[in-house]
Amino acid sequence: MGQKVTGGIKTVDMRDPTYRPLKQELQGLDYCKPTRLDLLLDMPPVSYDVQLLHSWNNNDRSLNVFVKEDDKLIFHRHPVAQSTDAIRGKVGYTRGLHVWQITWAMRQRGTHAVVGVATADAPLHSVGYTTLVGNNHESWGWDLGRNRLYHDGKNQPSKTYPAFLEPDETFIVPDSFLVALDMDDGTLSFIVDGQYMGVAFRGLKGKKLYPVVSAVWGHCEIRMRYLNGLDPEPLPLMDLCRRSVRLALGKERLGAIPALPLPASLKAYLLYQ
C-alpha cells in the first residue's frame, strides 16, 4: 500500500479522516473514484492481444531503451551515464476513458522516475539526469520519487501530488499502480493500491496523448499493461445496474453469484461472461 513517510512510515487510507489534508484549501478535494472509472475498474481486463496493441512503441523511443522481444509489454534501459530516456505507447488517445497499469520496481527508479502522458512532439531524450516528462508544454508527468507534478517545467512551478501531503511528508509509490486518462473530461489521475489519488492534471481535452515514462536507472525494466477503456457515450443502464449488484455483494462474495436464484443469462451477465 502507498505510504507516507515523516519521522516514520504511516499507511495512507484516504477513507480514514485522520489522513485528510490539514490544509483548509485541500479539504474539499474529492478522493472518491468517478463513476465511469469505478465501472471500468470493475470490468475484466482486455485480452493480451489488445494489451499488445496499446503497449510500448519500439519505434518511438530514445535510442537508449528497447522493447523486450520476449515480453513486449516491458522496455529495458541501457546503463548509459548522464542520460534521461523516454518511450511512448503505441496509441494516442483523443476520446474516452483509458486505464493502464505501470509496474516499475522501486529499487530501479533512481533520481528521476517520471510517469505520465505526452503529445507526439514531446522529446524522448535529454543529456544529464532530469525530469524529462513534464519539462515542456508537450508532456505531463508525476515524479514518483519527489511526489511532484510537472508540466512545462522550465516555465511553471511543480505541484505536490498526492495533494494531501504535508511539506515534511513523502509518499512511497509501490512497484505497481494505475494511470487513468479521461480525454472526455481532460484529466489525468493515478490510483495506488485501489485508492484514487485525485486529479493530477486538467485541461487535456482536445489533445492526442500517449502514455509515456522517462527513466535514468541503468537496466531498469518498466511494464505497461493496458487494462481497458470506455467510450464517451452515456453509460448503459444495464451496466450501471450490474455494477450496483456487484457492489452490494462485495468482492468477497462475487464467487457466490452462480448459486444465486437467478436466470443463467443474468448470472452470466453479472460475471461479465
Swiss-Prot record:
UniProt keyword annotations, A-Z: Cytoplasm, Phosphoprotein, Ubl conjugation pathway
Origin: domain of life: Eukaryota
Subunit structure: Component of the probable ECS(SPSB1) E3 ubiquitin-protein ligase complex which contains CUL5, RNF7/RBX2, Elongin BC complex and SPSB1. Interacts with CUL5, RNF7, ELOB and ELOC. Directly interacts with MET tyrosine kinase domain in the presence and in the absence of HGF, however HGF treatment has a positive effect on this interaction. When phosphorylated, interacts with RASA1 without affecting its stability. Interacts (via B30.2/SPRY domain) with PAWR; this interaction is direct and occurs in association with the Elongin BC complex. Interacts with EPHB2. Interacts with NOS2.
Biological pathway: Protein modification; protein ubiquitination
Phosphotyrosine, modified sites: 31
Organism whose genome encodes this protein: Mus musculus
Name of the molecule in the record: SPRY domain-containing SOCS box protein 1
PROSITE patterns: B302_SPRY, SOCS
Cellular component terms (Gene Ontology): cytosol
Molecular functions (GO terms): ubiquitin-like ligase-substrate adaptor activity
Pfam families with a match to the protein in the record: SOCS_box (PF07525), SPRY (PF00622)
Subcellular location: Cytoplasm; Cytoplasm, Cytosol
Function: Substrate recognition component of a SCF-like ECS (Elongin BC-CUL2/5-SOCS-box protein) E3 ubiquitin-protein ligase complex which mediates the ubiquitination and subsequent proteasomal degradation of target proteins. Negatively regulates nitric oxide (NO) production and limits cellular toxicity in activated macrophages by mediating the ubiquitination and proteasomal degradation of NOS2. Acts as a bridge which links the NOS2 with the ECS E3 ubiquitin ligase complex components ELOC and CUL5.
Domain comment, as recorded: The SOCS box domain mediates the interaction with the Elongin BC complex, an adapter module in different E3 ubiquitin ligase complexes. Essential for its ability to link NOS2 and the ECS E3 ubiquitin ligase complex components ELOC and CUL5. The B30.2/SPRY domain is involved in MET and PAWR binding.
One GO process term, biological-process aspect: ubiquitin-dependent protein catabolic process
Residues annotated as domain B30.2/SPRY: 33-231
Keyword set includes Nucleus: no
Annotated SOCS box domain residues: 232-273
Family: Belongs to the SPSB family.
Listed SUPFAM superfamilies: Concanavalin A-like lectins/glucanases
UniProt xrefs under InterPro entries: B30.2/SPRY (IPR001870), B30.2/SPRY_sf (IPR043136), ConA-like_dom_sf (IPR013320), FBXO45-Fsn/SPSB_families (IPR050672), SOCS_box (IPR001496), SPRY_dom (IPR003877)
